[in-house]
């Protein structure tokens, strides 16, 4: 198993709310969550793994993430953990108002749930109606009479009484219908009422990540609770406020949404969309964090936004409740209830679509209040370096340093080169990608890296018509025409100008970037450098030669019947007898150029080919450094001649040489200051090896006996490094003024991180001028080629 292989581990989605009557179950999907089969599987798995977990001292199985940091469950002693079920029920008070109700250990919680399940399934009425011990009676204090705490005042005894009355009302039905009804009232073997109590935390634990693990099943979500004034979200204070808005004493601006929240304020106080997962133990942290970051948090914020603006969630809850009553009156049972709700409730349909898409690694396109929202866990099909041979990855993955362009945006998920290299952390994907529900848009990092995307092109991963149909776009819409205009040989900047002039579309660079980001996020396009016959391409080390080669040979032959076969075409690009050459060397004539470029795009799409990029470092030889040192010495000597020592200074030096009483002074503050200045002065370069004394009358220049020096960042060169560079330009290479201009454009790319191909795209430098400059300074650069 590997982080590069998608594994959502999603079992189902469960929606619960909290009203003045307490926690309530609204909808769950899929229907298989409520079945005797899953219940028996849960109990069997619990019996098989209980001893194993105790012997191996497994980490805490139940945790609740609060707003700041995760808290450890160390509150129970070893003696308390060894209590039997009966002792636990008699000595421990399980009050939903108490924080220990949510912070218990796995064994305590399962003992409680299993005992209640046995009691509920018991056939004897006397056993069901047996009085509870005084320790389990509800304890209600005056401190917890606030509206927020009233939502969680159901204790174990109250839940048991409700079950007893429910079982007594259904005692006249036959045994088959009773068992079916019991299956409908549980989720993975847990009673819905108990899960509602667990999954409706106090308000202090809402509006933040909530995670609890019960019997290897993870219940994770983002519970959303309304504020004291009934609003569901708050904004920071802005310059201009609308009429009717209220500013609190702490500087927060609350929206006056009395029209939409007056009803829900008195009824629904919290809603919680819970995702139920069963991830592998080794990948537990990573899979849960991945699901929460990409899907759960964003979907919860969207629902909060719609609830705040349009009271959407509460209206759907009332509709679902009414639909359940209508269905039971018409059918007499719950057969087909899920399908009935999905067909008539947009929220139920969104939950269903979300589960089916995410569990299949697809993109969930949800219509939330008639607005299209897309959610997904990005699949790792792009790598910036070659993974280890033992690290699994998806066939046809793309290998290129170009993927670093979107590494921090959250639009793509770069693959891991080592097994479990991220150690369960999403630190590389979480920054730079945030979903602001108040702004109702997906915001990406607007730094210089994402600005460079206009110099790149898009490679469509599917047929344009299929993409337009899949994203539900109108055929004549702006994005549809943009998709039809995409060519892998043209940059987005050129495409924007083309749309403005020829297609008569008012498309600016920002809109083109937005379209490109959406296509990348929807997995319909890939960012690449524009394909060119002058570039060098090789067979990718990650080419799917052992997976899809035979099928792709047929597909390549069907798409390009006039071209050589796929193996022969790949041999043209990476012949073992010669170095890689420009792609133009493989094209027979100009008439074949277009079809060969299309074939190159096809190979790039399926991961068979990658582009070789050229990276350059600027090298400073020892000869250059010695010449610069001589120039500095001559400059220092000239300064001495132009500024001779005055008689007073000469007399002072003689006095210091003959007067022994001043020896302590000469060895004291002045020399100490000189040494301190020299020590504290920042070096020009770690490899410069030159130190200059701050005393103008005693300049010491020291040249360390080292070899050549590579300047790591010429764009931010120090004064000494600039002298080295000028010595190369004007004395060693003697560049013409035109070449000097090209050199300074080229200088900031000599860091080994930015390729020369990017220089050609951004700085408007011709290949001829670049080749001429490279030939002139070839003795002072180090160049390498890789993907």
Curated annotation (Swiss-Prot):
Indicate the secretion signal residues: 1-21
State the InterPro entries in the record: HTH_NPRL3 (IPR056603), Npr3 (IPR005365)
Record keywords, A-Z = Meiosis, Signal
Give the Acidic residues compositional bias ranges. 69-85
Q: Where are stretches of biased composition, namely Low complexity?
A: 157-179
Asked whether the keyword Transcription regulation is assigned, the reply is no
Chain coiled-coil ranges: none
- The record lists its disulfide bonds as none
Note down the stretches annotated as region Disordered.
25-89, 121-182, 233-262, 661-693
One cellular component GO annotation, for this chain's record? Answer: GATOR1 complex
Q: Which GO BP terms apply? A: cellular response to amino acid starvation; meiotic cell cycle; negative regulation of TORC1 signaling; positive regulation of autophagy; TORC1 signaling
Which residue stretches does the UniProt record annotate as biased composition, category Polar residues? 139-154
Q: Describe its function.
A: Mediates inactivation of the TORC1 complex in response to amino acid starvation. Required for meiotic nuclear division.
What family classification does the UniProt entry report for this protein?
Belongs to the NPR3 family.
Protein name from the UniProt record: Nitrogen permease regulator 3
Tell me which species this is from.
Meyerozyma guilliermondii (strain ATCC 6260 / CBS 566 / DSM 6381 / JCM 1539 / NBRC 10279 / NRRL Y-324) (Yeast)
**Lineage, top ranks:** Eukaryota, Fungi, Dikarya, Ascomycota, Saccharomycotina
The gene is NPR3
């Amino acid at each position: 198993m590997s982080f590069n292989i998608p594994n959502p581990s999603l079992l189902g989605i469960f929606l619960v709310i909290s009203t003045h009557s307490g926690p309530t179950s609204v909808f769950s999907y899929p229907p298989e969550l409520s079945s005797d089969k899953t219940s028996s599987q849960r109990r069997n798995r619990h019996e098989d793994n209980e001893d194993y977990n105790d012997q191996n001292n497994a980490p805490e199985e139940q945790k609740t993430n609060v707003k700041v940091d995760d808290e450890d469950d160390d509150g129970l002693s070893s003696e308390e953990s060894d209590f039997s079920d009966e002792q636990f029920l008699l000595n421990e008070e399980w009050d939903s108002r108490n924080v220990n109700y949510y912070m218990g250990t796995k064994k305590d919680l399962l003992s409680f749930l299993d005992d209640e399940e046995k009691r509920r399934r018991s056939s004897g009425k006397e056993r069901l109606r047996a009085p509870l011990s005084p320790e389990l009676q509800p304890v209600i204090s005056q401190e917890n009479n606030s509206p927020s705490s009233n939502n969680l005042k159901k204790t174990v005894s109250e839940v048991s009484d409700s079950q007893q009355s429910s079982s007594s009302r259904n005692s006249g039905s036959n045994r088959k219908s009773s068992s079916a009804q019991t299956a409908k009232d549980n989720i993975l073997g847990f009673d819905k009422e108990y899960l509602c109590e667990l999954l409706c935390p106090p308000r202090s634990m809402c509006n933040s990540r909530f995670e609890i693990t019960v019997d290897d099943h993870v219940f994770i979500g983002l519970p959303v609770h309304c504020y004291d004034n009934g609003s569901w979200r708050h904004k920071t204070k802005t310059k201009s406020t609308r009429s009717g808005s209220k500013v609190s004493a702490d500087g927060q601006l609350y929206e006056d949404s009395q029209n939409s929240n007056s009803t829900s304020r008195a009824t629904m106080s919290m809603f919680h969309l819970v995702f139920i997962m069963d991830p592998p133990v080794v990948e537990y942290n990573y899979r849960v964090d991945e699901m929460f970051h990409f899907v759960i948090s964003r979907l919860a914020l969207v629902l909060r936004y719609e609830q705040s603006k349009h009271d959407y969630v509460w209206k759907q809850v009332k509709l679902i409740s009414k639909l359940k009553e209508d269905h039971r009156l018409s059918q007499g049972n719950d057969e087909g209830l899920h399908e009935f709700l999905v067909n008539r409730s947009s929220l139920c349909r969104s939950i269903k679509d979300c589960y089916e898409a995410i569990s299949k690694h697809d993109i969930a396109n949800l219509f939330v209040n008639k607005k299209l929202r897309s959610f997904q866990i990005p699949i790792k099909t792009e790598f910036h370096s070659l993974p280890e041979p033992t690290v699994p990855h998806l066939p046809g993955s793309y290998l290129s340093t170009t993927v670093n362009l979107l590494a921090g945006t959250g639009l793509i998920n770069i693959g891991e080169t080592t097994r479990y290299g991220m150690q369960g952390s999403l630190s590389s994907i979480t920054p730079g990608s945030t979903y602001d529900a108040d702004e109702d848009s997906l915001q990406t990092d607007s730094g210089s890296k994402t600005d460079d995307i206009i110099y790149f092109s898009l490679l469509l991963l599917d047929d344009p018509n299929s993409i337009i149909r899949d994203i539900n776009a109108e055929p004549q819409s702006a994005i549809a025409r943009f998709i039809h205009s995409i060519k892998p040989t043209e940059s987005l900047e050129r495409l924007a100008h083309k749309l403005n002039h020829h297609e008569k579309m008012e498309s600016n660079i920002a809109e083109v970037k937005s379209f490109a980001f959406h296509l990348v996020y929807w997995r319909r396009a890939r960012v690449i450098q524009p394909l060119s016959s002058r570039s060098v391409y090789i067979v990718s080390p990650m080419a799917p030669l052992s997976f899809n080669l035979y099928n792709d040979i047929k597909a390549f032959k069907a798409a390009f019947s006039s071209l050589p076969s796929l193996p022969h075409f790949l041999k043209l690009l990476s012949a073992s007898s010669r170095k890689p050459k420009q792609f133009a060397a493989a094209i027979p004539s100009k008439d074949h150029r277009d079809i060969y470029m299309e074939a190159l795009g096809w190979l790039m799409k399926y991961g068979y080919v990658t582009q070789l990029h050229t990276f350059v470092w600027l090298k400073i030889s020892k000869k250059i450094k010695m010449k610069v040192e001589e120039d500095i010495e001559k400059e220092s000597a000239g300064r001495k001649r132009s500024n001779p020592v005055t008689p007073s200074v000469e007399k002072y030096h003689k006095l210091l040489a003959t007067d022994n009483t001043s020896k302590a002074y000469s060895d004291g503050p002045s020399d100490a200051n000189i040494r301190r200045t020299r020590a504290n002065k920042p070096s020009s370069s770690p490899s410069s090896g030159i130190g200059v004394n701050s005393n103008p009358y005693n300049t010491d220049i020291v040249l360390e006996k080292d070899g050549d020096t590579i300047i790591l960042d010429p764009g931010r060169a120090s004064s000494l490094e600039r002298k080295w560079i000028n010595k190369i330009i004007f004395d060693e290479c003697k560049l013409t003024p035109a070449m000097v201009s090209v050199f300074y454009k080229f200088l900031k790319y000599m860091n080994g991180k930015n390729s020369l191909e990017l220089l050609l795209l951004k700085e408007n430098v011709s290949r001829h001028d670049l080749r001429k400059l490279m030939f002139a300074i070839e003795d002072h650069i180090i160049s390498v080629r890789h993907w």
